Amino acid sequence: MSKVIGITGGIATGKSTVSELLTAYGFKIVDADIASREAVKKGSKGLEQVKEIFGEEAIDENGEMNRQYVGEIVFNHPDLREALNEIVHPIVREIMEQEKNNYLEHGYHVIMDIPLLYENELQDTVDEVWVVYTSESIQIDRLMERNNLSLEDAKARVYSQISIDKKSRMANHVIDNLGDKLELKQNLQKLLEEEGYIQSESE
């Protein structure tokens, strides 16, 4: 029977890498970040609603959402962040639901890649939650390198979410990503074997 698994973690813990690895085992991925971009793509109803709230500056010269402009506003104004979420979240849910149901109808196991799964209280929309775990210090280092952020900015982003330790305690399974990609792959393979998704190579 097909299962719906929520993959989450903290910022820069390696969720995308885990999703990428899972596709090789036949899982289908429904990505919240991709759905979020789809919700406000050029010419969409969602983008038109964003423009109504944030003004013409919210649209760049290519007719797409000016993410930097909108991002800076919502980071400093919680009320406008809430207004943006009220536009985007229902559209994202609809996109993800359609994608998920399509995969389930064809008998696939589905991975719902949702960075803010616990923050948005979506744990009851999936059969299980798997958290990709790494330490906060590694999160901060990766974020500084990947996004070219200062130490203070990286810490602010990490601490704006529920801590990775708390998420791990709430999860059905924790995938350790304290090492390199090979170790991550081995840890993931072990979980898939234990849960019966794949056969052990030693069998």
Swiss-Prot record:
Keyword field: ATP-binding, Coenzyme A biosynthesis, Cytoplasm, Kinase, Nucleotide-binding, Transferase
EC number: 2.7.1.24
Gene3D superfamilies: P-loop containing nucleotide triphosphate hydrolases
Binding residue positions for ATP: A12, T13, G14, K15, S16, T17
Location in the cell: Cytoplasm
Residue stretches making up the DPCK domain: 4-203
Gene Ontology BP annotations: coenzyme A biosynthetic process
GO cellular component terms attached to this protein's record: cytoplasm
Catalytic activity: 3'-dephospho-CoA + ATP = ADP + CoA + H(+)
Matching InterPro entries: Depp_CoAkinase, P-loop_NTPase
Signal peptide: none
Sample GO molecular function, one term: ATP binding
PROSITE patterns from the UniProt entry: DPCK
Entry annotated with the keyword Transferase: yes
Record function comment: Catalyzes the phosphorylation of the 3'-hydroxyl group of dephosphocoenzyme A to form coenzyme A.
PANTHER family in UniProt: BIFUNCTIONAL COENZYME A SYNTHASE-RELATED, DEPHOSPHO-COA KINASE-RELATED
HAMAP family (UniProt xref): Dephospho_CoA_kinase (MF_00376)
Family the entry assigns: Belongs to the CoaE family.
Name of protein: Dephospho-CoA kinase
